[in-house]
Amino acid sequence: MKNDNNNQQQKYKKLSLSVAIAAIGTVNVAYALQEMTDTELSTIEAQDGLYVNAEYDSATIGRVYWQDKAGQSDNTETTLGMYFDGVSLTKTGATHSTSASHTGNLHTTINLDIGSSGASTGVALQSSAYFGTLKADSLKICDSTGATCGDSYGSFAVQSQEDIVFNLTTQNGLFNKNALMNVDLGLKNLNFYLTQQAAGAINNQFIVRNFNFNFTGKGYIYVGDSTETNPSYQNALVLETRDAANYIDLNKVEDVDYAGKFNAGLNIDMVYKGNTGTTLSTKDPMNPVKGVLRLGASGRATNASLVVKGVDASTILGAAYDVGGVTAGTGVGGSLAGSQGLYMRVRADFTKHDDSLGGEESTLELAHGGTNAYGVEFSNLTPLLIRTSTDLADPAKPLNTARAYFDTGDVYFNLINSKKVQLPVNDTLNNSRLTIGSTTGNITTNADYLHLVHDGTTSNPNALAVAVRGFNFNAIARTTKFISSSDVTGVDIPTNPAQNWGLGLPFYNLNANMITYGTTVSGSERLGFALGLSTEGRNTTGDKTTSIILIDGADNPLDSNNATNYYIGLRNIDMLITAYGTLGLENNKINLNMPKLTIAAAMELAGGYLPGSRYRSIFTGCSAANEIACYAPVDSFTKKDDVFLGVKLKLDGSMNLDIVPGVDTLAGNALSFVGNYDLKGAGGDYTASTIQLVDPIDGSIIGFDNITGNIGFNNKIKINKDTIAFSYGFTFNPDKAPDKVFRVRDINLYPATGNGQRLGEMVMTGGRLDTNMTFKPRN
């Protein structure tokens, strides 16, 4: 082969290919290859691996879609598709690139080496990609041909500000179940945009800015077969750490705009931007984004796993119903989820400050979104039990060494067509007595768990369903500190050290259905949705719970200065929430209009010591001979000793809710919830609303029954430099309408035995109730 440049002396140990690719490698399209010159071919030697560098200016793809099978009420299965139309890739200019020559150029780089020790073959893969802005003009759910579609969700875009990095190293094969593998995945500083067009051709955006999912890990990647003892692993792609020595590190990421400042390894920063035109930007000083909420997680986790697979003939969502909501399908053809679907499950154990396994301890962050934002970092994550029964039986009374954890349970993704969807029944609520006047029943019935997707009468919308079954989050944060966004400087930066107070938001056996579809209301693009969500209050032994509790971790001198672990809050929350309606980005707010919102719950207002804690005082019976009496029982969440009162409620009506983002200043960045809840009363599609307070000793009840009327609300949460402020405002009958007067038609007393007695009623024709609370934690 002729070499016109006489450069044969410059040989490479790797194969170097120069190609022009018409689309990013993750998109299932054809690639156009540029013809290689003799000069380029002369550099090929391929002795030591494969090196591919692909650069391109832009790409246009007509349609990208995912198809799924869906059952129907007539027992015939159909095919539905989720279609991204008008897909394009364009430059936006990378800020951080693995190669200076790549800055601003769309590119994919792959470096693959394969080596052998004689007994095994190892693989080393290093790759990076920069795709600029990946945009789809619309997202619709369509029939099998893609010709008949529902309304658009809006337009979607993903914007990369630096390279995506994926590295993998293994010493024995690629999907070897018993071969340890090192993995790096760097999704850093991505921006996600949902753009909806409101009436008047005004574009508004919901944005996840500076998204990070940046981790390194040691573990195993393989495809499980039908012999796996864990059912979720069967016929699935499995990533797991498996052994105690292996781990996942969520590493913090340098802020793309503020050198030397870092955001969480998993960073979900949600903001709102109104009247955007056609621009995709989070850095417009003339139209800054407004913060909504930021969630973050960093640090080392262990006992982690990720499972992904396809599932067949799932009955997880129940039967498909016709538009009348009467006729239900049967068999696979009538199963709402159909014969195909996607499945995922993720779990991990958190580490804490004295058990970090050589890495950084796990931390969680909750903050206002955007810039000029304060937040709170939670750490020292532990289970609910301070000591187990085994620990208390030990003369040394050691602390519980088990780790806090989360487990998403089974998560299913399906395209569906149905009037109703099924949620698993909460037996506690179904068996919890709820007496209203002379009518005795239960808080919920089986019918409450078959909830509506929509209230239309002509046809069911084709929709995306995400179903969660058995999500557990068994973690209590025992240490907390205030934090701020990267742009905050000087005296505005929180300086307080980590403090011994915490927040417990554990939940047990959470089940949920989330249904979404595109729709149009009064000329505005909106998101149709239906929600069903339930939690279980506790398990039988009381070591898992759904609760909202504050923790005081002051030193206990009677327990070697371990934390005292006082708590107060709502515990053992059995809850069911169902709703349907539409969501839109309008008028600088996120609006949810729900024609029907039902909330049913049973819970306890309680305060005391966390299970297994050493009492701070010497109680009767506590002695050296009877040390067990010096500790809170490990099953104390199954007892009534800490309970001030029980609460039962069922509220049913319509709600219009505005989630109002804060303005881009330290003083103004807050999150507000503004709207009204119209309690309808029994009749038609609605049931009676009631709130009942239960005596924990004898079970007698005072009931505020048959509640009707309209309640307006304006509530705000504001995290400051060293305080957390809550503002609540309730307006009764805000429209001053005679038929919307707030009324408790019956105030009843229900003794533990015997018949209930009506005490009277309460009517509020108008008025306002305001409450402001500010918490300033101190050690």
Regions from the PLM with identified roles:
Residues 43, 48-779:
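N-terminal low-complexity, acidic/Ser/Thr/Gly/Pro-rich segments
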Residues 1-35, 44:
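Gram-negative bacterial Sec-dependent N-terminal signal peptides
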